[in-house]
């Protein structure tokens, strides 16, 4: 699928980029900053250094050049004076926008990339299994097909790097007919893989299935390690997990399957959702969802909305769900105000101090139970905080689902409090 080898033996220098975003009136400056910070995190994940960020207040991106002529001139002036390899935009660019922007930066030989291409590049870098590699390659070609501009047609002359981690590095002729044939081939290959995956899932149908879902980089893989007590790759990078990981776990004597799935993100490319159908089937066909949320992130509620919307989009929005607020050890309680004194403990000398972990969990539970219909648990998977409460909630749901499948499998008296064992430190 992807040839990641450099075209020469010398070590390549770190690539540099400037980031560009538009900010509609409904979007606060803080939101704009957070969105650009997320884009910068994507860029960092690919080993690229962000040199500068440009924003423009526009209700909608300019149909020709994404930003207005004045802002475009400002960016051109900057990249002409600074060592910049690429200009990256925080939205999908249309084929005509790509052509116009490439023309605007042609004299500087600067690559023009958008958010979807960055995400596809990260997925290409992370994919390990044949299924994931095929899914990513299909998504890449589907993205490439309407965008056969200078970026793609001259790939054989490029040195590779971010945005070039695709078929061009194999010196394939980027011709519409060839790409269309390749898309057809990959779809057929993926259909075969999907049928094999479906057969494997049917063989596992006798077990309750639990899927970890959530925004990218919220700690799903760390939580998987805690629950499964197994080695699962976890890293503080976006999309550290692309391939689904399945582990057999037991609660009491009831086994269930726990799946760590790919994280969601704002503006997830449609081609990825389509290509990752089989991977997302692990979520669609799960009996129970663990929706993991990084409560320490300032935009965690927006991230929850992104995940909820994506789950609804793939047909998994109505499943029994436990909302797992993770990273409570990093959570910063609201700044104290007169109306906010519940967030602090009052001492005898009327001074205040930050809430203890137990008190903080109590306040958070009170707040979110009033707003969410699902089970809500507050944990730190990294620090092993409050994991027993999560196991109890999850165990109850697994038992209920299991007995729906096998109502006479165990005597009623099998379960008692002694079956709940705390994880050893």
Predicted regions and their residues:
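Switch I (effector-binding) loop of TRAFAC-class P-loop GTPase G-domains
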Residues: 2-4, 202-205, 227-256, 270-275, ...
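N-terminal accessory targeting/assembly segments
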Residues: 1-115, 119
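Conserved Switch II/interswitch segment of TRAFAC-class P-loop GTPases
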Residues: 25-26, 62, 92-95, 284-305, ...
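Conserved catalytic network of the ASCE P-loop NTPase/AAA+ motor domain
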Residues: 11-12, 79-81, 248-252, 257, ...
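Short alpha-helix plus adjacent loop in nuclease-associated cores
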Residues: 116-136
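Switch II of P-loop NTPase G domains
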Residues: 2-7, 33-37, 60-77, 243-244, ...
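Switch/connector loops and helix/strand junctions flanking conserved nucleotide-binding motifs
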Residues: 27-30, 62-65, 95-100, 120-124, ...
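C-terminal-of-GTPase-core extension/linker across diverse P-loop GTPases
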Residues: 1-20, 40, 146-218, 224-225, ...
């Amino acid at each position: 699928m992807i040839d990641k080898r450099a075209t020469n033996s010398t070590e390549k220098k770190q690539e540099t980029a400037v980031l560009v975003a538009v900010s509609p009136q409904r979007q606060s400056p803080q939101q704009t900053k957070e969105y650009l910070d997320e884009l910068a995190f994507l860029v960092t994940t690919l080993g690229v250094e962000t040199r500068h960020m440009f924003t423009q207040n526009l209700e909608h991106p300019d149909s020709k050049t994404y930003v207005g002529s004045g802002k475009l001139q400002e960016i051109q002036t900057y990249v002409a004076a600074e060592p910049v390899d690429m200009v990256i935009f925080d939205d999908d660019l249309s084929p005509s926008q790509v052509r116009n922007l490439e023309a605007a930066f042609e004299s500087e030989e600067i690559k023009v990339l958008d958010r979807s291409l960055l995400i596809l590049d990260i997925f290409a870098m992370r994919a390990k299994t044949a299924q994931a590699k095929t899914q990513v390659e299909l998504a890449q070609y589907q993205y490439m097909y309407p965008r056969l501009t200078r970026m793609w047609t001259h790939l054989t002359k490029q040195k590779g790097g971010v945005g070039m981690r695709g078929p061009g590095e194999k010196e394939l002729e980027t011709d519409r007919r060839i790409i269309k044939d390749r898309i057809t081939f990959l779809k057929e290959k993926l259909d075969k893989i999907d049928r094999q995956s479906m057969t494997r899932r049917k063989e596992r149908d006798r077990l309750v299935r639990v899927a970890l879902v959530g925004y990218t980089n919220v700690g799903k893989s760390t939580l998987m390690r805690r629950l499964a007590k197994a080695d699962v790759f976890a890293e503080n990078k976006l999309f550290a997990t692309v391939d689904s990981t399945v582990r057999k776990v037991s609660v009491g004597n009831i086994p269930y399957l726990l799946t760590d799935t790919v994280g969601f993100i704002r503006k997830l490319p449609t081609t990825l959702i389509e290509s990752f159908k089989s991977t997302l089937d692990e979520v669609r066909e799960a009996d129970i969802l663990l929706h993991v949320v990084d409560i320490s992130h300032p935009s965690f509620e927006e991230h929850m909305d992104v995940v909820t919307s994506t789950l609804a989009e793939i047909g998994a929005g109505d499943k029994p769900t436990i909302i797992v607020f993770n990273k409570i050890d990093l959570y910063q309680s609201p700044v104290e105000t007169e109306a906010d004194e519940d967030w602090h403990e009052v001492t005898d000398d009327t001074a205040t101090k930050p809430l203890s972990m137990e008190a903080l969990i109590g306040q958070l539970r009170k707040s979110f139970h009033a707003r969410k219909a699902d089970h809500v648990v507050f944990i730190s998977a990294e620090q092993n905080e409050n994991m027993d409460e999560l196991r109890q909630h999850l165990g109850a749901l697994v038992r209920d689902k299991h007995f729906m499948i096998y109502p006479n499998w165990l005597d009623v008296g099998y379960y008692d409090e002694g079956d709940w064992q705390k994880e050893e430190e």
